[in-house]
Each structure stands twice: as C-alpha cells, then as structure tokens.
C-alpha cells in the first residue's frame, strides 16, 4: 500500500471519530494515532460534553497513545486529524514528539499547522513535525460545513420561537 492510500485509510478512521462528535452535537473533529501500522489511540472532540476547553480530539488521542505505549514520547507515531490542529493541540504534538501529522481540512481561523501559522515547524523549538495536508479534504470539509449549517438553522429556529411567544 502506498503512502497516499495508507494516509486515506487512516483518515477514514479519523472521520469515524468525527462522526461520534457530530452525534453528540460537538464540532465534528476526529483523530487517530498510528504506531507500527496499527491504530493505538482514537479521540474526538468533547468540549461541550466534558465542559472542558481541553477536550479536543488530538489531546484525547495523545493521552490514550501515551498510556498504551507507556511513554509520553510518541516518536514513532503518526497523528491523523480531520481538522488542522489549534495552538493547544499543536503544542501537545510538539511536546509528545510526534514526527508526522496528517490533516484533513485546513482551519483558516485557528489552524496552527500552516493556515494561520505553523507551530509544528518552528526551528527554535526542540521538535518539529512533518505535516501533510488536505487528505480526504472534501469529506472532512463537508462534515464541518454540514455541522455548522445545521447549528445555524437550530439557532435560527430557537431565536424565532423566542420572539413568537
């Protein structure tokens, strides 16, 4: 299997995690971490569910991967995530020494793997990660767009019902 099809295979698994977030009415972001050709950790966004700003997909997956490997250093792992990491998640990726990050769609408002800035390639830091972007971009982007379209429609209906009383 070539690298492109391998990346697509694991991004599809990250998309499955994003669907779990979607089902909880969370922003649909999913993540998997792969070590030696096997998924060792999965995570999805749970900020509202857990009432925590730290409950991002990447943070959840990094915690699980560290526990699984018995080490905070994830030096032989690849992280797959459906949406470009924010600054907090990029920091966690650097701290956990993940060497490769594969991103589904970019985040022009808060992305820290190339959109707004690239924290994963700051040479002054003690670690950098190779970043591959736009893997299954259309599927990842469509899920985000659909989620926010539905959210806006729900908010509009709620607002309408408040003013119709």
Feature roles, as predicted:
Residues 54-55, 59, 63-96, 100:
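Helix-adjacent hinge/juxtasegments
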Residues 47-49:
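A short acidic/small-residue loop/turn micro-motif
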Residues 25-29, 75:
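Short, basic and Ser/Thr-rich N-terminal targeting/leader segments
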Residues 9, 38, 60:
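Active-site phosphate/pyrophosphate-handling residues
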Residues 1-24, 88-165:
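Zinc-dependent deaminase
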Residues 29-37:
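Short beta-strand scaffold segments in enzyme catalytic cores
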């Amino acid at each position: 299997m070539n690298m492109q099809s391998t990346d697509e295979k694991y991004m599809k698994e990250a998309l499955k995690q994003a669907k779990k977030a979607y089902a909880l009415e969370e922003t649909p972001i999913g993540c998997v971490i792969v070590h030696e050709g096997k998924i060792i950790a999965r995570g999805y966004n749970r900020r509202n569910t857990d009432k925590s700003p730290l409950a991002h997909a990447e943070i959840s997956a990094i915690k699980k991967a560290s526990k699984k490997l018995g080490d905070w250093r994830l030096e032989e792992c690849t992280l797959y995530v459906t949406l470009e990491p924010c600054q907090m998640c990029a920091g966690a990726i650097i701290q956990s020494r993940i060497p490769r990050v594969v991103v589904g769609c970019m985040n022009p408002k808060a992305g820290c793997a190339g959109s707004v800035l690239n924290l994963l390639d700051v040479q002054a830091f003690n670690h950098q990660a190779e970043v591959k972007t736009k893997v299954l971009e259309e599927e990842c982007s469509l899920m985000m767009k659909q989620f926010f379209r539905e959210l806006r429609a729900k908010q509009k209906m709620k607002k309408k019902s408040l003013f119709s009383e």
